[in-house]
Amino acid sequence: MVPGTGRSGTRYPRPVMAAAYVLEPVEDLDTAAVGAVRRIYEEGFPDHLRADFTSLTDNREDGESALALVLRRQPCGFAMLRRLGVTGWTFLRYFVVDQRLRGQGLGGIMWDQLIAWLRADGGTLLVFDVEDPGEPGCGPAQVQVRSRRVRFYQRHGAVVLPVGGYRTPHASAGDDGWAPMLLMAAPVAAGGPAPGGGEARAIVSAVYQHRWRLDPGHPQIAATRVAAPDS
């Protein structure tokens, strides 16, 4: 196998070190380590927010990367990426650290390494969605969890895009199968400006097309509102 490539021939930037931790493609791990990644993933997301694990590892789409944060060959976290077409932007499908190791700063370590990994790969923007703390019917405990998650990303340079009505298709998300979410984005370049209203419409279109595979005329796209950029 050529250094810097996965078993499928997909080219990866070389692992980015931060102290003793390293990001590695999941397909380069041994069977036991892949099993640990699966546990981390399945413990970290409820059923309605996760895909089948094998679809993320053995049956990935072109432009997708499955990465594990590893310490001395032991996985500590998992991230799943998908390129948003030819935009130079990347969608963060999943980002989770081992529940048994939370509170040790691993989320920040993995985030920093992920941004460095994307920078080395020529990426310019990382886009993702999170559960909305303001969703009607969300109980106090869930509001706290969701708000804490948003603040984590904001501390690491991400912003909530000025978008209303953004929803994602999930089989268990209410009667109509669509879940209201917040759309966030973070610049990959060191010190780069955070995206704002001027870029939001293009980001929304790229996410619906390349992450959710919606046709340009899908009514959900028209129902998603983008605030006018500041003058």
Name the predicted role of every residue range.
Residues 9-55, 68-70, 203:
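Short amphipathic alpha-helix that is part of the acyltransferase structural core
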Residues 118-141:
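Conserved GNAT acetyl-CoA-binding A-motif
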Residues 153:
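Conserved active-site tyrosine of GNAT-family acetyltransferases
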Residues 104, 128-131, 161-164:
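A eukaryotic "domain-to-IDR transition" signal
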Residues 42-99:
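A conserved beta-strand-loop-helix scaffold within acyl/acetyltransferase catalytic domains
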Residues 145, 159, 166-214:
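C-terminal "cap" of GNAT-fold acetyltransferases
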Residues 97, 103-120:
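Conserved acetyl-CoA-binding loop-helix of GNAT-fold acetyltransferases
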Residues 203-231:
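Long hydrophobic alpha-helical segments typical of transmembrane helices together
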